[in-house]
Swiss-Prot record:
Entry protein name: Toll-like receptor 9
Alphabetical list of Gene3D superfamilies matching this protein: Ribonuclease Inhibitor (3.80.10.10), Toll/interleukin-1 receptor homology (TIR) domain (3.40.50.10140)
Cytoplasmic side: 840-1032
Ranges where the TIR domain occurs: 868-1013
Protein species of origin: Homo sapiens (Human)
Tissue distribution: Highly expressed in spleen, lymph node, tonsil and peripheral blood leukocytes, especially in plasmacytoid pre-dendritic cells. Levels are much lower in monocytes and CD11c+ immature dendritic cells. Also detected in lung and liver.
Amino acid sequence: MGFCRSALHPLSLLVQAIMLAMTLALGTLPAFLPCELQPHGLVNCNWLFLKSVPHFSMAAPRGNVTSLSLSSNRIHHLHDSDFAHLPSLRHLNLKWNCPPVGLSPMHFPCHMTIEPSTFLAVPTLEELNLSYNNIMTVPALPKSLISLSLSHTNILMLDSASLAGLHALRFLFMDGNCYYKNPCRQALEVAPGALLGLGNLTHLSLKYNNLTVVPRNLPSSLEYLLLSYNRIVKLAPEDLANLTALRVLDVGGNCRRCDHAPNPCMECPRHFPQLHPDTFSHLSRLEGLVLKDSSLSWLNASWFRGLGNLRVLDLSENFLYKCITKTKAFQGLTQLRKLNLSFNYQKRVSFAHLSLAPSFGSLVALKELDMHGIFFRSLDETTLRPLARLPMLQTLRLQMNFINQAQLGIFRAFPGLRYVDLSDNRISGASELTATMGEADGGEKVWLQPGDLAPAPVDTPSSEDFRPNCSTLNFTLDLSRNNLVTVQPEMFAQLSHLQCLRLSHNCISQAVNGSQFLPLTGLQVLDLSHNKLDLYHEHSFTELPRLEALDLSYNSQPFGMQGVGHNFSFVAHLRTLRHLSLAHNNIHSQVSQQLCSTSLRALDFSGNALGHMWAEGDLYLHFFQGLSGLIWLDLSQNRLHTLLPQTLRNLPKSLQVLRLRDNYLAFFKWWSLHFLPKLEVLDLAGNQLKALTNGSLPAGTRLRRLDVSCNSISFVAPGFFSKAKELRELNLSANALKTVDHSWFGPLASALQILDVSANPLHCACGAAFMDFLLEVQAAVPGLPSRVKCGSPGQLQGLSIFAQDLRLCLDEALSWDCFALSLLAVALGLGVPMLHHLCGWDLWYCFHLCLAWLPWRGRQSGRDEDALPYDAFVVFDKTQSAVADWVYNELRGQLEECRGRWALRLCLEERDWLPGKTLFENLWASVYGSRKTLFVLAHTDRVSGLLRASFLLAQQRLLEDRKDVVVLVILSPDGRRSRYVRLRQRLCRQSVLLWPHQPSGQRSFWAQLGMALTRDNHHFYNRNFCQGPTAE
């Protein structure tokens, strides 16, 4: 026995060595399975549902790993040796592995255990993120740590021992350890001097921790201190003592304004907050101060004394609606760049007018002013007069103020203004404002309803990625989501320098004729999406000589009016137009037969009905041919079922990008791409392609990117991509591919930069050919270890293709099949000769004797004799056109054409009755020559003529042959009221079928009807009432 063991051990070692050699010869697996190696030494293990830290193989270049991300897994225990094998690790992300109960999506209890030397074993670690984990104490940390995040944990105590020795620490984040989503019975406790030993700490964030005082003895090196949304309602100079290096201080949300709170809120106590006049006076280096949501109703000028370097001041969500008309607190803030005063409204009040305090004029360095949500109804030159003298003001936000009267010409007086946002107001047109309107501190007030304070709707998807970005232009005016019904030239008087105008989401329903924008001679970008424009005039928009981008998307209402024509000839007159969007207008007919432009480079025509237009013969076949310089064309969501070669032939030859996403294309003539010699990008995602056949990509094509994702592709012809020598990016994701073959690509495979095959049901059989190919091009396959998954066999479904090495695995099913076949062959080889020799004649006699007694043998001859020419005789009232149409188009098609080899033979009066015979002879032959008689009825209350005669013959057959051959199909819901129908439903329910009026039920109806016509009604009778007719 010992000898056998000693002999087998070297043999097993030899087998293992051979297997290892085969593995190395077949190709190299991804180094960091199941994770993915990304640029700059990052190993990404996010969202892999890991329960432990993966230990990578010795062959992996572990020394090159500088960042490891294990976010959003299920790791509950960290061992001492988990990261010791990564000697160069600098960044480690472990967030969202074991969240506290309140933050868990399913509120499951969880606790993370960290062994003492887990992080000490990584002496190079610089950044550690333990946020969103249920840990109670700060673990032991290496001295090399620079950034530490312990936010949204259950750590409620910080003392000098917690962070001892972390002299290199510069960033410490401990937000959300005690608040309404992560509740606790106490506040975060920071012992005095607990952080004093962190001599290099520059960033400290303690937001959402129920703190009532500023932690004492903070390190003097702090530059950023974030204490917002705690309960600190008193601030004095000693609270921020020694923090002379502070650059950013956030103490907002500590004494909240609850009428505007989007989450649970505690009202600020009366006569609070209390800020000492000298609270910030010693912070001479302060650049950013946040006092938002602090229930401030006035500003003390001494608060800002000594803050000569202040650049950003956030005073939003307070009660400063009157203060900003009188305050002198801004006089010394000469370096202020950004000021936020949004949502400083008086509860339930809208002021008639607002005049800013003269002290705003001293903000000579101000670049951005946010004043949305203050609620005043008129805007004129007196409103913003102090701002007109500010040379550096670039951005002014005035949205959501209920402004209904606005003099837009006042912005000409602002020398450096680049962006004005007046969206989400109630501006309805040009207005003449008087100078006697009420002021914010004592004028006319309108009480608001609660619904008026609802947030603005989120923008729907538009052509933002299509048109040029207005941020690069000199002056932009946003008037979207107002109450504009018409556009008048007077609105834009003195705005000739305006370059970008947004008028989307209004109610503009006029016919533009070339006079609406006359003053805007410098306009380059015009957004008129989500309106109701009538494009009828030939000279629309021709008053804009510099217009480059025009967005007319989502103006579908005029195009839906029957009989009204629409004129696109204005496009030819816009000599500088380069970008045009006509998307989502449901354009389908009665428009210009051709678009013409020599300057247009990009056209968005998605969301229309081009499939209907091209179905109208040659009327719109040349619709895009006049766009001689077009480069980018989007025809997505145009209900295209086919794309014929002559259609591509009539597209502009200059096209480089063609998008055909989300149509109904089931096939594509790939050879027709040679009609577009400059095409580089083709997007066919979201169609109904079943296979990539019909030839291959043509030779000489310049196609660089092809997207056929989200189709139903299950087959690709060999060599399909091989002729496209310049193809570099190919997206085959979300299809029905079971393999990926090297023969599809040929020599092109090595040149691919992106090959996306994720979300395909790959068949992970042993020796799968696609494994070797994907390993060859693994650098081009995004998410290869985690996103490329098996679809079959069942035990590997949904798992990574690397769940086991498919090149070396043993196919158990095949092994069992081979064993069974070999066993059967041996048994037959031994048994058959032996039985033949011993009792051959007896076996032959018994075989034929049993064969003669088999039941089906006796029935076969009778069945041939009783064979009938038809399976069913269909009887219906021909005078009812709807019933006749249903029979000929629906019933006949489903039973004779759609059932394949199981098709039924129907007898129809107008098709199968023999001429020359009498009506009764044909009727008799049809009833007695069919297995069933099918009555199709719209109503059952009045049955006569052929229907009545056929029913009487069927009943006669019941009496003579004792065979019930009646099957009823009732098309109207009222038909079931007949007493006969109700009685028959009770006795033989499956022979009475009701046509479903919901499409979802029609498939079941045809299945039930097929069963009723192929089986004897005797089997359908309810045995509780009767046994049904039986033959004697």
